[in-house]
Amino acid sequence: MFKVLSNVVLAPNLHRMMLRAPRIAAARKPGQFVIVRSAEGEERIPLTIGDADPRGGTVTLFIQAIGDSTRKIVEVAEGGYLRDVAGPLGMPTEIEPWGRVACIGGGVGTAVLFPMAKALADAGNEVTTIIGGRSKPYIILADELGEFSHEVRITTEDGSMGRKGFVTAELEEMIADADRRPAAVFAV
């Protein structure tokens, strides 16, 4: 059983859930995931590990509640328990000191991008993060990404936050400018 320490709604149908999972927190690397089951007999769901605190023994998951199984997971309130959390699983993202990098994500993809961007910054890279969404309520983790990104650029399809349009326009401008051109681009 894994205790839910917090469960916060970030955007429509998107939750940030922090769990007590010391073994997973100590072993996880960026790009890995866990398999979560809310209760006995429920479906097993793969979820990206958004963040981990090895000292505190916690992992953070970002969960888009779009089906019955993910809805049952996010219905577990703070203080409640998830039946199973298996992991970390999967091949971690290889992190190198590239220099200047661009990290790009949209909507719930921003949550998947978060651990990769953080690890790239921790490795000494100058990270420009470009995030997008349909509208302002779908822009997530901008402040958190700003804590370690050199720059955070935001786009929304309707122009309600940041630049109107798509993340690709921001990337095209960055690539066209020799002074801002990234050595590597990571997109989810």
Please annotate each region the language model reported:
Residues 68-188:
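FNR/FR-type flavoprotein reductase catalytic core
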Residues 1-78:
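Ferredoxin-reductase
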